[in-house]
Amino acid sequence: MTVGAGISVTDSDLVVLGHRVLHGVPENVLVTPASGNALIDGAFIGVTSDQTGSHRVFSLGKLEDLRFMCVFRFKLWWMTQRMGTNGKEIPCETQFLIVEANQGSDLGGRDQSSSYVVFLPILEGDFRAVLQGNEANELEICLESGDPTVDQFEGSHLVFVAAGSDPFDVITKAVKAVEQHLQTFSHRERKKMPDMLNWFGWCTWDAFYTNVTAKDVKQGLESLKAGGVTPKFVIIDDGWQSVGMDETSVEFNADNAANFANRLTHIKENHKFQKDGKEGHRVDDPSLSLGHVITDIKSNNSLKYVYVWHAITGYWGGVKPGVSGMEHYESKVAYPVSSPGVMSSENCGCLESITKNGLGLVNPEKVFSFYNDLHSYLASVGVDGVKVDVQNILETLGAGHGGRVKLAKKYHQALEASISRNFPDNGIISCMSHNTDGLYSAKKTAVIRASDDFWPRDPASHTIHIASVAYNTLFLGEFMQPDWDMFHSLHPMAEYHAAARAVGGCAIYVSDKPGQHDFNLLRKLVLRDGSILRAKLPGRPTSDCFFSDPVRDNKSLLKIWNLNEFTGVIGVFNCQGAGWCKNEKRYLIHDQEPGTISGCVRTNDVHYLHKVAAFEWTGDSIVYSHLRGELVYLPKDTSLPVTLMPREYEVFTVVPVKEFSDGSKFAPVGLMEMFNSGGAIVSLRYDDEGTKFVVRMKLRGSGLVGVYSSVRRPRSVTVDSDDVEYRYEPESGLVTFTLGVPEKELYLWDVVIQ
């Protein structure tokens, strides 16, 4: 029987839009049609079973000889990508799966184009579902509650399946369908984005780690400001809180890491962030509090936003039970129990320490009071938001609380209620939070760290960092704006990281040590007023990269696309040679010399480019390459070759070409010295007056502006009604002129070309 959008189980085959996706489907597998207007493009898969248990596994059928890409948790905290063609290649803890159902799976023998089938394992009651494969190529549902006493499940709505010819649309519609079904989270498009995303920032972590002091924060901000690149937000990371160990706890010692045995001992700051503070002695004097630090750094450094770090449980080891002044949170030591799927993937020193020492878990019924006390204090001293870390630890603590899903919902509801009350700009960054317990419980949180950390001293981690964020974003970007993490501007891979963030649509912030900056690089990202040219969407892989492996196959480049108001941008990266090793459970360089890779960029790599063209567009475009400085006219359905050596990148600005009635053609590139050149164009209008054309633009920033004009030198270029000198290259059609440094923040230049 056919249900949903052409989805059926026929003769033990799961058939989607005429394509066989799974075969050997067991008789206990259910396919339930979705209901409601938003759900017409999909159906739910579930199982019937008389089995009970807090951890159950069921087969859905065999997946064979079809290309897929999935994102799965390779650590308790984080996801990464995996590509393959058979079910046995699907790892445990897979939370998103997309399968290419091509001609070979067409049961009717007809010549059909590919369809894309998305599988989203979701929450049902107190259980969470994930996908995994087995050696028989079966795609399995793993169902888990996280509490041995929670063992009864319904089983009818465990996985949502959607299909269509446009992979990006299918993914978005699938998540929106689950949103309507669950009613427990909101899609990214319906969330308020905090303004800090639009400005350059600095984070204390890789500069000082937990040793950070108030003096260090001032020094870091002043060092960047002195170079002419002024941060507008700062994240004071781990190291500001009042923490301590139990007498019986075992200290965790590792380079550049926190002591995970520590617990929170006070809501307020430690002595390092008090005026004239002394170790081991904190005072409750408002005039000496964290507020004096915030006031100082905001007033002296033109800061707009200050965020501070805390764990979702207060600190890594939770809140210390019975400590004076915090008894009313009713913290009790609990011992984490990780799921088998996570345990099979990594050896985590953090989890090992917390498991050994336990975690002081605030009573879920008191956790809003805890968050509100913490956040209201922070807001009162001038803090604008928080980076809430260690979130996935909650899934290990569900026993005795009705299970992992119920505990996560209580904590996230309380957290978001406190954020709404205390930080009106929705000031929260979600971190170490790549599980669906949290994603499907987030109604308001709008920013999420999208991959494992930037590891400055691990050469194997950099290329996989870029690839992981891009592929994770296919899933995470439907829930929140992905955050690509901090990076160092002075580093062998600094340009590589910077270029990726320029196309990511994300916040841009560094963790440089004072005095260790590459200001020339930062000026390609940051305007003089501290704002950035942030693209409109989460940066995602182009559709032709979905099923190729840019990390391991020795032949594929990674292309990441995004949109500006009137242009597109594509970042191309050679990521080959290193990745996460599932055997050694660490990042590993598997090829010291992965070689040069060739590929191409096309106009339609920018998936929704037609939506931002300010006219009826024929499909021709101008492509400007940032590193090579070349301007190329690219006719519709043609491509531009690109060749990159290992760890190299290139950024292309892609601009729809406007053809006027006199045959002349025009396309604005933007600020040519910036990575995301086209992000500077805020408005664009074409007036076609037959014998002449007029182009009116509003631009942000300063520096060299480039536009394409095909057949003649422009008659004039004016900026704010003043004629300006310009240069015209008839061979390429490139017109360039310079914008000065505006006196006002976010100033818009009025540019007219005719």
From Swiss-Prot:
Pfam families linked to this entry: Raffinose_syn
Keyword Glycosyltransferase: yes
Enzyme class: transferase
Catalytic activity, EC: 2.4.1.82
Family statement drawn from the similarity comment of this UniProt entry: Belongs to the glycosyl hydrolases 36 family.
Gene that specifies this protein: RFS1
Entry protein name: Probable galactinol--sucrose galactosyltransferase 1
One Gene Ontology term of the molecular function aspect: galactinol-sucrose galactosyltransferase activity
Function as written in the Swiss-Prot or TrEMBL entry: Transglycosidase operating by a ping-pong reaction mechanism. Involved in the synthesis of raffinose, a major soluble carbohydrate in seeds, roots and tubers.
Catalytic activity reported: alpha-D-galactosyl-(1->3)-1D-myo-inositol + sucrose = raffinose + myo-inositol
Sorted UniProt keywords: Carbohydrate metabolism, Glycosyltransferase, Transferase
SUPFAM superfamilies assigned: (Trans)glycosidases (SSF51445)
InterPro entries: Aldolase_TIM, Glycoside_hydrolase_SF, Glycosyl_hydrolases_36
Induction per the UniProt record: Not induced by oxidative stress.
